[in-house]
Each structure stands twice: as structure tokens, then as C-alpha cells.
């Protein structure tokens, strides 16, 4: 980027002194908002076309400005554009380059427009596109998770289900995958809902109060792919709730991906041994030759924190800004850019990694059988015989204590020990003690029984289309 050369500012008419160099450095946003160059030029092309349609500019002026903008865009795409710090931001850089290329007629581009509505429309365009792109990437991961659920349902792979990270009850591995499918479906929906709400163009709001020029805001909104213009000019230039909603959706998705990351990290440890992550998505140690580190999942878990921080940062920025535009709002973009970039790569990595992850069914089944995971099934067995569930719970709790003190599992207890705990317990309860029967018994809607999981997969497959 070219440093300041103290050219005359496009807004410099009322100023008698040049901008202080440190102020210029502090004030400039072109280092990051140049990312909006494509959106900025699209907005300008729509604006100048509308100015011609309503008779504010001649057709020759429209053509000259439009061709000039096209040439500037070509330079940007080619990487030959000279971004200058003294021109502050993407808008002034583009307009100054246009002026250098086509002369004073470039100044007519800004008729009936302010940088306030210009940046608002640029940022909305970017954020709307980012929301829809993350929705698509979330959908792709959802499809991968669904395929994994289908694969593991066919083999009826059993996994221990946990509460408090203690073995709770056996579940199907497919049921575990479907839990994340459900989360990702809501995540995708949040991005699409946010994109629909931000589908309004602030272009034409001007500085804050609208403009006396006879512009057609509906025309520019349509040209830019928006459903409608914003209904209030103050709101159009002064609100950033669309960015907050986007960041909120990012934060919730990040929380889900962080939970997934934590489970994959734990399940891949030597102590658990439930799965093996692919070599392509793990790393080694500089000193310990045996190490295979889950860096992708660890970074995905950690990066959730920066996404949360981006949301909190923007909330803190906007909470004290009066209507309408304030320079504070320059701080709205980097967090959105960063969250979008972060989630884009995490979603892609998991979409690649999960199908290559190997689950060890014999290990997960053995783990599911430990920790007295079928104790609730024994209590249910008694309850079906008419024993009040709380009494059954007390009886089985005593059996668990007996087995635990003697280093045994429930199925190791003798018939006499079972009947001593309750006369309705005996050899026939053994069937309730298997993890397979425990899983099959959970037939309630949304449960882990194979038939219920199969239904959930079918519904999820239909929802994906």
C-alpha cells in the first residue's frame, strides 16, 4: 500500500490544514475495507445507472463513468491497483482512481449519495453473501454428517452416551451424528434467516435524511439483488444489527463446532481409543515420534473464542452510538471478515475430515457396556412389573453399589444377589442388561432405537433435498 502523499482530499474544501500524519494513519480503513471493492463498484454501477434513468446524468456521462468503473475493477482484480493510505478507505480510493482515469466527470458519481449509505450498502452486500455462503457450507457439512449416520446405522455401531462426561446410557453412533445434523440444520437456518432480514438496500439514504434529488431507490435495490430498500434513512445508514445477527449465527455455529471438536479430541485419545483421525488432518511432534496431534479440532475449538469475541466487540461498539452514522462504525467490518474466514475454513476442514475418520466399533461397544450403563433398563424392568420407579431406582442403585464394591458389572451378579435386592429380579433380567437391548428399547420419538434413527435419517435426507 502506498503511504500518504497528502493529495487534496475529496472532502477537503472546508479545511485549511493538511491532515496530521498520525491522524491519517489512525483514521484510514483501506487496509481492511479494500476487501469491499467489488461490492463498492457494484453499488456505484447501480447508482450511476439509476442517475441516468431518472435524468440526473446524461447517457454519455453514465457510459463514461460506468466504463471507468469497469476499468478500475479490472485493475483491482488484476492486482495492479494502487491502494493509497491518504485516500482513507475503499470508497475514496476507487473514486480517486476513477477521477484520475476519466477526469472531472467522475465527481458526478457521488450525486445524491453519501459515504454513509455507500458503506452501508457495500457492507450489507458482503454480509448477505457471506451469510448465504456459510449457510451452503454448513449444509455441506450437514450432508457429510448425515452420510456418516447412515453408514454407522447400517452396522448398528454402539457408542456410550455421556452426561457429566460419565457413562450414562448406550446410544447408536448414528444417533450421535444425527444430534449434530440437527444442530447444523438450525445453524444453516439462522444464516438464511439473517440473509433474508438483511435483504434491504440502504443506498439512497444519503448521509442520514434522504436526498432532494428525484432518485429511484427501488431501482438500485433491484439492480443490486435486494428485495427492497430500507424504509427509514436513519436506520439505513446507522444500524448494524444485520452484522450483529450474522455474528450471532457465527457464534452459535462456532459453539456447536467447538463441542464437536472437544468430543473428537477426547475420543481420539489413547485412553478412549474410539476413533482414529486421518493422517492428512493431524500433525506430529518435534520431539516425540509417536505423537499424532488433533490440531484441526484443537484450533477449531480455540477459534470459537475469537468468533465469540467478534460478536461481543461489535455489540460493545454499537451500544453507545447515537443515530445515525458515527466513525465508531468503521470498527464493524474486521470482526465480520474474520468470523466469515474462520468458519469458512473450519467447515471445509470438517467436511473433508469426518468421512476419513475411522471409528472402532468394538472399542465403543465395550465402553458402552461399562460404567453400569444399563442400570436404568433394570429399573425400567422393575417398573414394568408394577414397582414404583423411585423404588426401582433405589433397588438398582443398591445393586450398582454392590457390583462396584466388588469390582463387577451388573451382569456378573448372581441370581441370589439379584433376588435379594428384589424378588422380581432374576435370570430373566439378563436381557435388559445388554447394550443392544438397551438401545433397541428406546423407541420413543427422537430416541436412539435403530428404527427411530432410521426415521430421523430419512426425514433429514428429505429436508436436504
UniProtKB/Swiss-Prot annotation:
Location in the cell: Cytoplasm
Pathways involved: Amino-acid biosynthesis; L-arginine biosynthesis; L-arginine from L-ornithine and carbamoyl phosphate: step 3/3
MF GO annotations: argininosuccinate lyase activity
Catalysed conversion reaction: 2-(N(omega)-L-arginino)succinate = fumarate + L-arginine
Known EC number: 4.3.2.1
Keyword vocabulary terms for this entry: Amino-acid biosynthesis, Arginine biosynthesis, Cytoplasm, Lyase
GO biological process: arginine biosynthetic process via ornithine; L-arginine biosynthetic process
Keyword Amino-acid biosynthesis: yes
Name of the protein this chain belongs to: Argininosuccinate lyase
Provenance organism: Deinococcus deserti (strain DSM 17065 / CIP 109153 / LMG 22923 / VCD115)
Name of the gene: argH
Amino acid at each position: 500500500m502506498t503511504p500518504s502523499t497528502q493529495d487534496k482530499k475529496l472532502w477537503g474544501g472546508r479545511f485549511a490544514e493538511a491532515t496530521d500524519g498520525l491522524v491519517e494513519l489512525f483514521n484510514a480503513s483501506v487496509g481492511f475495507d479494500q476487501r469491499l471493492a467489488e461490492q463498492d463498484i457494484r453499488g456505484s454501477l447501480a447508482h450511476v445507472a439509476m442517475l441516468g434513468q431518472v435524468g440526473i446524468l446524461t447517457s454519455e456521462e453514465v457510459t463514461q463513468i460506468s466504463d471507468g468503473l469497469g476499468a478500475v475493477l479490472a485493475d483491482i482484480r488484476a492486482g495492479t491497483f494502487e491502494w493509497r493510505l491518504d485516500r482513507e478507505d475503499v470508497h475514496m480510493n476507487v473514486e480517486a482512481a476513477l477521477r484520475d482515469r476519466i477526469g472531472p466527470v467522475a465527481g458526478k458519481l457521488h450525486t445524491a449519495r453519501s459515504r454513509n449509505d455507500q458503506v452501508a450498502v457495500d457492507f450489507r452486500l458482503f454480509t448477505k453473501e457471506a451469510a448465504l455462503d456459510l449457510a451452503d457450507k454448513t449444509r455441506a457439512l450437514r450432508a457429510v454428517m448425515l452420510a456418516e449416520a447412515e453408514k454407522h446405522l447400517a452396522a448398528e455401531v454402539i457408542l456410550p452416551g455421556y452426561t457429566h462426561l460419565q457413562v450414562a446410557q448406550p446410544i447408536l453412533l448414528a444417533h450421535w451424528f444425527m444430534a449434530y445434523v440437527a444442530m447444523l440444520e438450525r445453524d444453516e437456518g439462522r444464516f438464511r434467516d439473517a440473509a433474508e432480514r438483511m435483504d434491504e438496500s440502504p443506498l439512497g439514504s444519503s448521509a442520514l435524511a434522504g436526498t432532494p434529488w428525484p432518485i429511484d431507490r427501488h431501482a438500485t435495490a433491484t439492480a443490486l439483488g435486494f428485495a427492497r430498500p430500507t424504509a427509514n434513512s436513519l436506520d439505513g445508514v446507522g444500524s448494524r444489527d444485520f452484522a450483529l445477527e450474522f455474528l450471532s449465527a457465527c457464534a452459535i455455529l462456532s459453539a456447536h463446532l467447538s463441542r464437536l471438536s472437544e468430543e473428537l479430541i477426547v475420543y481420539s485419545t489413547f485412553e478412549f481409543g474410539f476413533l482414529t483421525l486421518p493422517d492428512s488432518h493431524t500433525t506430529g511432534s518435534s520431539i516425540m515420534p509417536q505423537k499424532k496431534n488433533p490440531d484441526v479440532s484443537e484450533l477449531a475449538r480455540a477459534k470459537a473464542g475469537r468468533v465469540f469475541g467478534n460478536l461481543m466487540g461489535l455489540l460493545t461498539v454499537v451500544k453507545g452510538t447515537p443515530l445515525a452514522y458515527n466513525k465508531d462504525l468503521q470498527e464493524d467490518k474486521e470482526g465480520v471478515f474474520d468470523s466469515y474466514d474462520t468458519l469458512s475454513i473450519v467447515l471445509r476442514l470438517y467436511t473433508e475430515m469426518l468421512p476419513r475418520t475411522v471409528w472402532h466399533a468394538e472399542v465403543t461397544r465395550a465402553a458402552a457396556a461399562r460404567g453400569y450403563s444399563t442400570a436404568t433398563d433394570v429399573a425400567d424392568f422393575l417398573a414394568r412389573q408394577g414397582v414404583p420407579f423411585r423404588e426401582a431406582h433405589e433397588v438398582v442403585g443398591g445393586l450398582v453399589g454392590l457390583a462396584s464394591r466388588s469390582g463387577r458389572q451388573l451382569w456378573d451378579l448372581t441370581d441370589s444377589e439379584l433376588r435379594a435386592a428384589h424378588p422380581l429380579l432374576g435370570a430373566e433380567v439378563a436381557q435388559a442388561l445388554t447394550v443392544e437391548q438397551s438401545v433397541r428399547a428406546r423407541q420413543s420419538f427422537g430416541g436412539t432405537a435403530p428404527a427411530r434413527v432410521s426415521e430421523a435419517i430419512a426425514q433429514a435426507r428429505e429436508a436436504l433435498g
